Design a protein with these regions (language model features):
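Conserved helix-turn-beta segment immediately C-terminal to the redox Cys motif
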Residues: 17-19, 34-54
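N-terminal "domain-start" segment that seeds a small globular fold
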Residues: 1-13, 50
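Structural micro-motif
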Residues: 60, 66-75
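Short acidic active-site motifs
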Residues: 9-10, 58-62, 94
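Short active-site neighborhood of thiol/selenol oxidoreductases, capturing the structured segment around
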Residues: 15-27
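Structural signal for short hydrophobic segments within the conserved structured cores
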Residues: 4, 50-52, 81-86
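Non-catalytic, surface beta->alpha helical segment in thiol-disulfide oxidoreductase systems
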Residues: 76-102
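Conserved redox-active cysteine motifs that mediate thiol-disulfide chemistry
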Residues: 24-38
Length: 102
């Protein structure tokens, strides 16, 4: 499963109301690069979840919409609503536990 590059123009059509894990990051963010392979691995294991990446420098309105103020921020959405928020780099197990609680 691939990770969708999200923007204002495609966010609602790709994510919609499906369960989703959205990774907010930036090219300059070291910890964002650290969690990227973890998110990619989880995406391959969970095809039932929509995975997305938002570069906050390119999509500041989406960052504002979800009140993202620090990086990396990972949001877990269900029915279009944030059900879990992770600030900073987390372990694979942390993300998996949250997905399994959906």
């Amino acid at each position: 499963m691939s990770i969708n590059i999200l923007s204002e123009s495609n966010f609602d059509s790709i994510v919609g109301t499906k369960p989703a894990l959205i990774d907010f990051g930036a090219e300059w963010c070291v910890y964002c690069k650290k969690i990227a392979p973890i998110i990619e691995e989880i995406a391959g294991e969970h095809p039932e979840i929509t995975f997305g990446y938002i570069d906050v420098d390119l999509q500041p309105m989406l960052a504002a919409r979800f009140r993202v103020h620090s990086l990396p921020t990972v949001l877990l959405l269900k029915d279009g609503q944030v059900v879990k928020q992770f600030l900073g780099a987390q372990s694979k197990e942390t993300y998996l536990n949250a997905i399994n609680e959906l």
